[in-house]
């Protein structure tokens, strides 16, 4: 762990003046939002190594415990953003857990306090979230760790997460929706799935756009039923989604929380997210053609149900 190299002068991070919206990470409207998101997600896609996976599991477990402590009332999106910070930190720094077995917990606490400030949530007391622990970190140590997290993130605290892509996929595939209430239900269910599946370390292997598409497809299989028969093909055929990664992400999601869409056969595009930078100007017309094709595809087996809460976890989260 690089704690010995931390900044000598601790900068106390205050809450942001404006609440950070995970579904709209930009501070000002973007002229071409999908191109901006795809450009930014490359800087916000963590990749947790096998060596760091144990530390990640411990940090995720601590965040989950805090999230479901009824007395603390931590918002699910605060926990989501906190674990995103953990992933992004671990993708750039190492924790010497053998020498400092408490390091993952300190990282989790610091990421929780940072996320609460970004979300303008009620202040999270470091003492409260450490209640019942064998030993407690003091405020100075937590603030030093906050500073190290911010340095690792290069102060890009407005994370681009899968939640930022949900609205785009829905508007691109359904520019003139006939069932807005059902689409709202699909989005709400996709958000729930993303919050619950996030602690699965394999989810960090997928870009935010792919994770968002997979969650929407899984949600469509649960919520929409026969009312939107072309939804699976419409999302899967977006020209900037890698079909193989989409399938793999769906499998991870199915294994993690018991929900899985049967839409793999509909994922016909092999282009990568980067391709959209050359296509985004025609994305609207392309999505309309995709929706027409998708409406003709009868996905009769796309209604696998979620089998309940996840088995062992439940954390339910671009700068200029």
Curated annotation (Swiss-Prot):
Q: Region entry Disordered: which residue ranges? A: 279-320
Which family is annotated?
Belongs to the cyclin family. Cyclin D subfamily.
Highest taxon above the source species: Eukaryota
A GO molecular function term, named singly, is: cyclin-dependent protein serine/threonine kinase regulator activity
Q: What keywords are annotated for this sequence in UniProt? A: Cell cycle, Cell division, Cyclin
Against SUPFAM superfamilies, the record matches this protein to:
Cyclin-like (SSF47954)
Originating species = Oryza sativa subsp. japonica
One GO cellular-component annotation of the UniProt record comes to: nucleus
Any GO BP annotation? cell division
Q: Which Pfam families does its entry note?
A: Cyclin_N
| UniProt keyword Cell division present | yes
- Name assigned to this protein: Cyclin-D6-1
Could you confirm whether the keyword Cell division appears in this record? yes
Q: List the disulfide bonds.
A: none
